């Protein structure tokens, strides 16, 4: 045993001697001087005191881990047995006797306090109940009740507190204490309910206590605890589960929801956001005077009124928020450079637009168009001696108004082609209006200048009426005489176009992501949806993720106007792209996006918005026309299933066909699409009693088989005039015919004779036309019809005559009419059926 002095110990622990002596005195050691010796046991006592003063544990509790292993055999069918081994692990922590004793004393005090409070509460309750019984019952009966109530309640039997084993876990004791605090009157209820023989007593007392403090609607506590104890092998000493974890608590007040309302919302969606049934919303709207259905689309103001009246908080959401966030993410950064102009060729039909463009391209394009008429937009990029120019060729027919308007929006300069021998026509004026509305400069090309009768001044004069003034007359529009056939003036036309482009200072950023507009789209049988896109800014590359209107996809391949594959396309370059999930509408904007998820979200959002707008428009149309259609005969409808080669032609045809008809007949395009006529199209035509029209497309084998079997009417066209004329003829046939009366002749009665066979015979002079025998007549007296019948007898000089002309006399016998007088007029007429027209 080594001993050190107090001074040496102070140097060792680096503490002043005076402080160490003070701590030793506090620990109960007899040391008072620095030279006194300190033994190992005294050091241990000092250390124990210091640890206890710093609230540190004297000794780490020792842990005892017990593992139990139980093996059993489970017999199954087939004389087989399965050996099941159950392993259980339990950890015991040794605690100090002082802590155990303190814990036991604390629990005992808490239990006594709870029992005293419960006893006092029970006595008060019994006394109160006895007083109520005394008030309700007569006086003789009140005495025994009062005596019984005055009897002291039996004292609760306090179970002897068993001494907790040394290996009891501290968390289990804490959980048991909290559980007893949660259930303060369990012991009292058990003692009051059971007597010495275990019989239940004081049932009215329990009922009154239960009525005073109703329990919340939760699952019984014993269920969780007992099942948990069963799973743990019957030992319920582990931490008990939390009570009331999933209990249903009814709301104390009305629940206010945050309802987000866009520009449109259906009744069902509004009810779902407010967490009410759709029937309640419909009932409330009915009270407001607005009948509705569960799928009816409400506008923002109506939905806001309904939600606020029902007590909810409304947040108005812009439907374009998703698209706005996408637009903000598209950044066009980089150096802007000059780009080639996009030139649209417009004009009246057959004025030579495609021939002029054909001469510039030095390729025969007009021969490929049916009838020499442009059916859809063609986009071509041309390298000239003066630079690159991109041309858009638009149709000149009246049905393609929307396509010309789109061409004007996507262009920089418009070449207005006017035939010198034909002058300004309706589509010429329309092209001028489109260009002026889009703010695009015009260059007038007076074509067919080589023909005799060409008058350039007449063209200038007619266009000046519509706000297009020639430079020669002091205006700002160049007029260039050209001949697409001979090539005269084409160089001057290109010079004027490029001069206008220099004035516009057209710029683009090739390093930015591609952005453009859809010129045309179609469905190719072997390649799927194909879209012709004019890149307006940035660069479009193969493999880019693009968003086009309500469609999206990755560019799998790009082709130029000659059908050759290319890897990228810069500004003002028209290309065909493959890889979209559908055929976009002509005029849709195309943009390159980096995130496929974002593109899909915006595309689906636009599709849903289109459906909602379409549904709302259809419902509004029903409500508006419901009273107009009452009392009217149902319109005759010509149903048509229309398939076209490209999207632009389909839209133009649908617009032209829907414009036909009148109050009695109408055209309804029940189905339309891009691509060939398929079996499903034939089935649709069969179900809707429709006519199949194919514009520049053909039917497949399955569709032809159905058409032959069912006798459907299917027609192919390649010129839009033929479709419109045939539909007009069909509608005219559906109109039926009108009955028209033609007055053949008029005879004036000069005298009246009597005949035993015919009665009164009128001696007449034919003053107008020809009087025919066996024709219907009218008898007019002072120009008022008094009889309508049939001419029975017509004679001249006692001879029967088939007809009598003007200026001759004759005798007329009217069938079943004898009241003919001198001065009457007999009008002979015939009824003719005349075909009606639109």
Curated annotation (Swiss-Prot):
Residue span, tr-type G domain: 338-507
Positions of region (Disordered): 30-60, 94-254
Start and end residues of each stretch annotated as G1: 347-354
Compositionally biased tracts (Low complexity): 137-173
Keywords, alphabetical: Cytoplasm, GTP-binding, Initiation factor, Nucleotide-binding, Protein biosynthesis
Region feature G2, mapped onto this chain: 372-376
Chain segments carrying region G5: 483-485
Positions contributing to GTP binding: 347-354, 393-397, 447-450
Family that this chain belongs to: Belongs to the TRAFAC class translation factor GTPase superfamily. Classic translation factor GTPase family. IF-2 subfamily.
NCBIfam families on file: IF-2, small_GTP
Protein name: Translation initiation factor IF-2
Gene: infB
């Amino acid at each position: 045993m080594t001993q050190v002095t107090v001074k040496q110990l102070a140097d060792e622990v680096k503490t002043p001697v005076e402080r160490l002596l003070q701590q030793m005195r506090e620990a109960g050691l007899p040391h008072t001087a620095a030279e006194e010796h300190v033994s190992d046991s005294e050091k241990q006592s000092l250390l124990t005191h210091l640890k206890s003063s710093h609230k540190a544990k004297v000794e780490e509790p020792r842990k005892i881990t017990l593992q139990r292993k139980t093996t059993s055999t489970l017999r199954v069918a087939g004389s087989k047995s399965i050996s099941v081994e159950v392993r259980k692990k339990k950890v015991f922590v040794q605690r100090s006797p002082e802590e155990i004793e303190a814990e036991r004393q604390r629990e005992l005090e808490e239990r006594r306090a709870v029992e005293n409070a419960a006893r006092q509460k029970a006595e008060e309750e019994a006394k109160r109940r006895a007083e109520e019984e005394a008030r309700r019952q007569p006086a003789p009966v009140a005495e025994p009740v009062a005596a019984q109530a005055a009897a002291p309640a039996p004292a609760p039997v306090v179970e002897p507190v068993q001494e907790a084993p040394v290996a009891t876990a501290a968390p289990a004791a804490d959980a048991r204490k909290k559980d007893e605090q949660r259930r303060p009157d369990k012991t009292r209820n058990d003692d009051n309910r059971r007597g010495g023989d275990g019989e239940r007593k004081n049932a009215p007392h329990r009922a009154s206590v239960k009525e005073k403090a109703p329990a919340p609607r939760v699952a019984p506590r014993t269920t969780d605890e007992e099942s948990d104890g069963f799973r743990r092998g019957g030992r319920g000493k582990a931490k008990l589960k939390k009570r009331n974890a999933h209990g249903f608590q009814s709301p104390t007040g009305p629940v206010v929801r945050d309802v987000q309302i866009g520009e449109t919302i259906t009744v069902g969606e509004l009810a779902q956001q407010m967490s009410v049934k759709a029937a309640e919303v419909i009932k409330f709207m009915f009270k407001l005077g607005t009948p509705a259905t569960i799928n009816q689309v409400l506008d923002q103001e109506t939905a806001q009124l309904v939600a606020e009246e029902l007590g909810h908080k409304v947040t108005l959401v812009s439907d374009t928020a998703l698209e706005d966030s996408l637009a903000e993410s598209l950044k066009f950064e980089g150096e802007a450079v000059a780009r080639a102009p996009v030139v649209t060729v417009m004009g009246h039909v057959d004025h030579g637009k495609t021939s002029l463009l054909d001469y510039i391209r030095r390729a025969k394009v007009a021969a490929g168009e049916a009838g020499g008429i442009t059916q859809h937009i063609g986009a071509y990029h041309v390298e000239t001696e003066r630079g690159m120019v991109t041309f858009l060729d638009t149709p000149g027919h009246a049905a393609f108004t929307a396509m010309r308007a789109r061409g004007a929006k996507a262009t920089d300069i418009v070449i207005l082609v006017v035939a010198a021998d034909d002058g300004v026509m309706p589509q010429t004026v329309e092209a001028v209006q489109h260009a002026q509305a889009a703010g695009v400069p015009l260059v007038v090309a007076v074509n067919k200048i080589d023909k005799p009768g060409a008058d350039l001044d007449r063209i200038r004069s007619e266009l000046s009426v519509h706000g297009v003034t020639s430079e020669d007359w002091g205006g700002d529009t160049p007029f260039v005489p050209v001949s697409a056939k001979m090539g005269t003036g084409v160089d001057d036309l290109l010079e004027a176009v490029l001069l206008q482009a220099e004035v516009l200072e057209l710029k683009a950023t090739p390093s930015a992501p591609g952005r453009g507009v859809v010129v045309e789209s179609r469905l190719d049988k072997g390649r799927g949806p194909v879209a012709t896109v004019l890149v307006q800014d940035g660069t479009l590359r193969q493999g880019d993720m693009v968003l086009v209107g309500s469609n999206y996809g990755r560019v799998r391949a790009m082709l130029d106007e000659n059908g050759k594959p290319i890897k990228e396309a810069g500004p003002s370059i028209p290309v065909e792209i493959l890889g979209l999930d559908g055929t976009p509408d002509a005029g849709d904007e195309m943009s390159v996006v980096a995130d496929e998820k974002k593109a899909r979200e915006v595309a689906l959002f636009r599709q849903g918005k289109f459906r909602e707008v379409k549904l709302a428009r259809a419902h509004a149309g029903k409500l508006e026309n419901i009273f107009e259609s009452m009392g009217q005969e149902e319109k005759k409808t010509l149903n048509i299933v229309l398939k076209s080669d490209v999207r632009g032609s389909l839209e133009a045809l649908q617009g032209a066909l829907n414009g036909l008809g009148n109050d009695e007949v109408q055209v309804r395009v029940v189905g339309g699409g891009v691509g060939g006529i398929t079996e499903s199209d034939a089935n649709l035509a069969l179900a809707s009693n429709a006519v199949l029209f194919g514009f520049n497309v053909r039917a497949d084998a399955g569709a032809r088989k159905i058409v032959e079997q069912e006798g459907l009417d299917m027609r192919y066209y390649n010129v839009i005039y033929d479709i419109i004329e045939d539909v007009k003829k069909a509608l005219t046939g559906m109109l039926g015919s009108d009955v028209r009366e033609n007055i053949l002749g008029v005879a004036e009665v000069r005298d009246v004779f009597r005949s035993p066979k015919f009665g009164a015979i009128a001696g007449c002079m034919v003053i107008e036309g020809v009087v025919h025998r066996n024709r219907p007549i009218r008898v007019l007296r002072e120009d008022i019809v008094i009889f309508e019948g049939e001419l029975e007898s017509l004679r001249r000089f006692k001879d029967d005559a088939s007809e009598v002309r003007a200026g001759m006399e004759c005798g007329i016998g009217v069938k079943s009419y004898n009241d003919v007088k001198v001065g009457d007029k007999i009008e002979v007429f015939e009824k003719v059926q005349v075909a009606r027209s639109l």
